[in-house]
Amino acid sequence: GIHSIELMDEGMILMDGPDMVYHTVGVVTTEAGKPQYVPITSIGREWYNTHGSVDIILDKSQRVDFFYHNTKENEIEGAACDIKGLPKRPPKTTRIRIEVSFTSQTEGVILLKDMGFGEMFPATGKIIVFPFTLIS
């Protein structure tokens, strides 16, 4: 059954159960010149209710680095997804929508969709499927 296991920061209680997700899935973005972790999913929900999305703007890189933060053990895993097959565009003119969903407590899929950048750089409709398996 479901029961609380620990008092988190800011008075939140992390619920424990056979279907609960303990990882956030997120990306690191740069804001005001400083790297910042942006979670896409949150913890404390059943895997089948855990999903989220965020839009990012690619700079020079054609890859997205994902981080999986195990909040129960305070461990972080990383993975990189190369984005191939997009038309050549100047830096900061490619918007990617990242959608994350879990398929079990420790597995899921990340969809990366090319959203283009206005009329000058239209979306291609390309979708990259990036499955993940959490090891911690």
Label each PLM-derived region with a short phrase:
Residues 1-136:
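Acidic low-complexity intrinsically disordered segments
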